[in-house]
Swiss-Prot record:
One of its GO terms (molecular function) is ATP binding. Its EC number is 5.6.2.4. Residues 291-568 form the UvrD-like helicase C-terminal domain. GO terms for cellular component: cytosol; DNA helicase complex. It catalyses: Couples ATP hydrolysis with the unwinding of duplex DNA by translocating in the 3'-5' direction; ATP + H2O = ADP + phosphate + H(+). The gene is uvrD. A 3'-5' DNA helicase, probably has DNA-dependent ATPase activity. Translocates on ssDNA with 3'-5' polarity. A mutB1 mutation is UV sensitive and subject to spontaneous hypermutability upon UV irradiation. May process damage occurring in non-replicating regions of DNA to produce recombinational intermediates for sister strand recombinational exchange. ATP binds at residues 33-38, 288. The keyword Isomerase applies. Keywords: ATP-binding, DNA damage, DNA repair, DNA replication, DNA-binding, Helicase, Hydrolase, Isomerase, Nucleotide-binding. This is DNA helicase II. The keyword Secreted does not apply. Belongs to the helicase family. UvrD subfamily. GO terms for biological process: DNA replication; recombinational repair.
Amino acid sequence: MMDISELLDGLNDKQRERVAAPLGNHLVLAGAGSGKTRVLTHRIAWLIAVENISEGSIMAVTFTNKAAAEMRHRIQSTLAKHAQHQLFGMWIGTFHSIAHRLLRAHHLDVGLPQDFQILDSEDQLRLIKRLLKLHNFDEKAFPPKQACWYINNKKDEGLRPNDIEDFNDRQEREWIKIYQIYQDTCDRAGLVDFAELLIRVYELFEKKPLILQRYQQRFQHILVDEFQDTNKIQYKWIKILAGKTGQVMIVGDDDQSIYGWRGAQIENIQKFLKDFKAETIRLEQNYRSTANILNSANELIANNSDRLGKNLWTEGEKGDPVGIYSAFNELDEAKFVASQIQDWVEHGGKLDDCAVLYRSNSQSRVIEEALIRCQIPYRIYGGMRFFERQEIKDALAYLRLINNRQDDAAFERVINTPTRGIGDRTLDILRNLTRERQITLWQAVQVATQENMLAGRASTALLRFQELINSLQLDTAEMPLFAQTDFVIKHSGLYEMYQQEKGEKGEVRIENLEELVTATREFIKPDNAEEMTELTAFLTHASLEAGEEQASPHQSCVEMMTLHSAKGLEFPRVFMVGVEEGLFPSFRSFEEPGRLEEERRLAYVGITRAKKKLTISYAESRRLYAKEERHLPSRFIAELPRECIQEIRLRGTVTRAMNLAKVGSLSNTSAVENEWKMGQKVKHEKFGFGTVINVEGSENNTRLQIAFQAQGIKWLIAHLAKLEKVR
């Protein structure tokens, strides 16, 4: 038997308590940086080495294959002195990989062929496009990507077509029909998409009690990481597998539940406590961040309701205050970030210490350009650079073709974007013509139509496309570059196509197209481009930007990423940019308290990525879709503890004292003389709970600017508003 002390060495009291807990159901509420992975792996090692649980009785579920591989490695390292423990019988994997393993073993029981194929997301979209066309569905009314989202969403909820209520809604009936057609096709062809893996296993357990009983008897100990990210079918899956006798330990953090938009249900943690009568323990000691960073995160997240509650703390240093920088605009903000990174390196830091976090991908462009100007290498983590993104390349291809009809690459990119019913056979005819007659694709259209080489429908579609390009050029000839770009995006059909993409992905694409218009408005033609038109100069600029190589995986560089991508990572030096009302939190969240709370959790995740130094910035004005808009600092800044933050003022710049006063970090004469203070929590009988973010005037002329949790920002006259102070 293994020496118990070896399993508990290096753990704090709370971690030891959970690793060595009696058998049963447990919730480990693990704060950011609290060592949850270590607790999980040591718990599994404890079960094997101390409780003498067979490896084959344990199932450990993670959310990524990388996390599963790391968990297996850590457990094996912990048990290294015991050669007999090779974890051969233990199942460690993601929900999808474990479901796949079960379906392979029981393919006959679920009506699948032995060699069934997994459909990835691209294969699924391609199949749905074909089926919509085959069954004469209008792709404008039923966009293929929205059909993918609908089907996957229903499967994640555990619903088959005949389970869905149509509420006498004709459109819903059509969506159900598409789901049914798609599923029938997959079943006939032996195809299984990712969402199908989970629902099919759940149905296997429901319909085959003997198979369920076999796995319930085998997997007596189930451990699940990142439980706050589980969706409905995953929760049902764990519940049915555990049965009445299985013992389940889940590790999660309700304060880091940030994937509601893709089906994750934060309430699953609460349901687990109720359904499994689980004991809760909190891991609150943080091994990552300084006290100032942690106290800022704690104060921020305390504004959310229905939390299970925890308070992060550290035995480490207090650290620097959280820096708050008020930029004049997004260009000033980007320049500031680049200069701060240079300063960090000059004082002994490394580039790969630094991360720039933003709410939306569209925000990356101005930061990228500032880093390029300063010759600071960077990498877009988990994504592509701005000018490499699909929707940007689509829009630029239209502009390139308008600018130059000889551009065959641009022609091929947009000829069927949006779809025009021009098939591969038609394109092959055009390509052959370009080879045989040494002409461009644009010219090949003229030849093919004049010589009747094409079917009437294809010929009509190609001529209409040429008419579109010609009219776009004619209509925009006298427009400034930004207006031309805006017009082309709108009238080419790109904007409408991406608008129909359901969910966050479509919204991000639209934001990126809007940012492209902003980029054209800000573009200044260089002195060495006098002979070029403004459009040609911009297209050259975009090509050069896209051609800049990202830093190699082994090169020290700044990491840039969305806040969602940052989850699970940590960096000594973190910049959170664009922390403004309407951007972060987003305007969309103002109408839904639940969505606003998820935005706050996202801010909490961002703050807790920082180990040593955190800077939060906002721009007083920002160009969005080529329009300059005034912005207020985010309510999230107002919710930070004043003793933990500090305004950043740069030498030689105009003071921004009044800007930061809006978020309550500096005193304001009228506020001092007044009973109302920035940062004061209040309750209004109509608008609900909020935070005072600005105070103007005095006595009966006092006006308060309040960021309400559910109603957004409003100005109220203090003595008429009937506000209740909340402590």
